[in-house]
Amino acid sequence: MNSKIRKILAGLFFVGITLLFLDFTGSIHAWLGWMASFQFLPAVLALNFGVVLLLVSLTLFMGRIYCSVICPLGVLQDIFGWFGKKAKKNRYTYSKPMNMLRYVMLGLLVVALVAGFTSLAALIAPYSAFGRIASNLLAPVYLWGNNLLAAWAESVDSYAFYSVDVWMKGGITLVVAIVTVVLLFVLAFKNGRTYCNTVCPVGTVLGFLSRYSHLKPVIEIGRAHV
């Protein structure tokens, strides 16, 4: 896929899914709710075979396009990685694949789902991880911004916005969200989507399928630029 097209699609999915987590009116869900149904693990758990088949087919044809376009956590890491590239002259360094860790995390997710340990499964699942980040860290800022607009609208006799209560979640959920975003930033800043390639169970499954993809990246040494 063309890099510019991929970035545009990734931006649309990232903004759309983020707004789904921040929306408190329900209006955005009416227009963009379909984006949530295209998340791989939720589709598997919901037995949405049509979506699963589509995502698998895309992977077999174009590689891990899901991780770089549709998954919000993958796109978030690309954003962090962009800052990393700007901050340092050197490109990403090669890291040996940690297959054992990947398969352990995948097995842990499967066991957690089968045993009914939903909290553990949610801790590992990428879509759930992004949801915690959006709900715990971004939602309060979004609501405060809404309330500022509501106050301004009221001052000019407009009711386009209305104030809502803002509350921050505390306890373990907030701590997990903070630790997750910090860890993702550090890993992506240094070496790109490390989480996707070593920890994420969805990345492990799609990475295996992408070995047989029709389109694969090819490095032409004669065209390399310094």
Question: Across the structure, where does each feature detected by a protein language model lie?
Answer:
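Non-ligating segments of multi-cofactor redox enzymes
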Residues: 1-223
